[in-house]
Curated annotation (Swiss-Prot):
Superkingdom classification of source: Bacteria
GO cellular component terms listed in the entry, alphabetical order: cytosolic small ribosomal subunit
Keyword Ribonucleoprotein found: yes
Family label: Belongs to the universal ribosomal protein uS9 family.
HAMAP family per record: Ribosomal_uS9_B
This protein's encoding gene: rpsI
UniProt GO BP: translation
Listed name of the protein: Small ribosomal subunit protein uS9
Taxonomic lineage from the root: Bacteria, Pseudomonadati, Pseudomonadota, Alphaproteobacteria, Hyphomicrobiales
Amino acid sequence: MSETMQSLDQLSALKTTQPDAPTYTKKVDKFGRAYATGKRKDAVARVWIKPGAGKVIVNSREVEVYFARPVLRMMIQQPLVAAARAGQYDVICTVAGGGLSGQAGAVRHGISKALTNFEPELRGVLKKGGFLTRDSRVVERKKYGKAKARRSFQFSKR
């Protein structure tokens, strides 16, 4: 860039060389399933999705049995509803660690990532909805000299 800019028009006329947006390809195994792992708190979910009638199996059990609370089942369905693919994919997942809320969040994260592996064009919709972002909030550790992470022991003035 040896010549100097004289106006803003010249600056906007310059073509900036930006790298092209990365292209995502369909990643499917020999059985026609897309695989992804999802994490939330201490829970880790391994998720496989394939085209089907919309059945969801969690740890070899129906989703209604494993996640009895409707809020948790709704959390799991959110990525499919946001992508307008509810009832079009069968979901099989194994989840371990954490409690039920963390496990539901891990399954939701895994379903979102598996959907992008199966249909890369859904990535924008799921990213905008915040389903592909790993929720990094974990339990704060307990500190010595304290009763819990932040709670102090009872203080007596006299």
